[in-house]
A protein has these predicted regions:
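Positively charged n-region of N-terminal signal peptides that target proteins for export
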Residues: 1-4
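Bacterial N-terminal signal peptides
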Residues: 7-18
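C-terminal cap/linker of serine protease catalytic domains
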Residues: 21-29, 55, 70, 93, ...
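Conserved active-site neighborhood of the chymotrypsin/trypsin-like protease fold
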Residues: 33, 40-120, 135-139, 147, ...
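Catalytic nucleophile loop of clan PA
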Residues: 37-38, 144-165
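Extracytoplasmic/secreted proteins, especially bacterial periplasmic and envelope-associated proteins
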Residues: 104, 122, 140, 160, ...
Length: 218
């Protein structure tokens, strides 16, 4: 799929001392946390909220080794979504599709950085079910989803983002069924995408602070 350049690898460094390198006490060590998708050329990235939960530092990297620190613009805990901002322009943004047109048994493509590996993983599958959780609508997909795919997009046949990977199903017995993962419709991200990062100085200060450190990748 030629649009994998739209993806980013989301890494975090938490406040916990266990994430700090033994030989670099003043440098946060980035832990692979999940995936994301570029939704605006000015540096806006959409991911899952649980990917960046409790993070002290957030930074992203593409498969082409472009790396940048990010700030959290806004979150939607109800739908497990988060919008990040990096200080750059001219990025290639993902085309956004119409989630309302997604139907049962529709072919989809998922993409992300499985297991925190730097190579993009692309899998094909179908919409196994369109379910509701309370008043929410979620897509059940049968594509292979692994740790690290959370926050990554699902594409329709036209290469448009129609959903964001959020979770795998876990049965109360502890059994994790194969081929049973969920994605939130991209339409739930509309309120987040409508917001802008107005505090430019905050991003500039944050970026400068990280650049003064020797930020390591785990």
């Amino acid at each position: 799929m030629r649009r994998i350049v739209l993806l980013v690898w989301v890494m975090v460094a938490a406040a916990s001392s266990s994430l700090w390198g033994a030989e670099q006490q003043d440098s946060p060590v980035g832990k692979p946390a999940g995936s994301g998708v570029i939704v605006h050329s000015d540096g806006y990235v959409l991911t899952a909220e649980h990917v960046i939960a409790n993070a002290k530092w957030i930074f992203v990297m593409t498969a082409e080794e472009f790396r940048a620190p990010a700030i959290l613009v806004s979150t939607d805990s109800e739908h497990d979504l988060a919008l990040l901002k990096i200080e750059t322009v001219g990025l290639t943004e993902a085309p956004i599709g119409y989630a309302g047109a997604v139907r049962l048994d529709q072919k989809i493509i998922t993409a992300g950085f499985s297991f925190g590996l730097r190579e993009v993983s692309v899998t094909r599958g179908r919409i196994a079910a369109v379910r509701t959780r309370g008043v929410q609508r979620v897509f059940q997909v049968d594509a292979a989803i692994n740790p690290g795919n959370s926050g990554g997009p699902i594409f329709n046949g036209r290469g448009e983002v129609v959903g964001v990977m959020t979770s795998k199903f876990s049965h109360p017995s502890g059994i994790v069924p194969e081929g049973m993962s969920f994605a939130g419709p991209i339409s739930y991200a509309t309120p987040l995408l409508a917001k802008k990062c107005r505090n430019k100085s905050r991003l500039t200060r944050y970026t400068s602070q990280i650049e003064r450190m020797n930020l390591a990748i785990y």
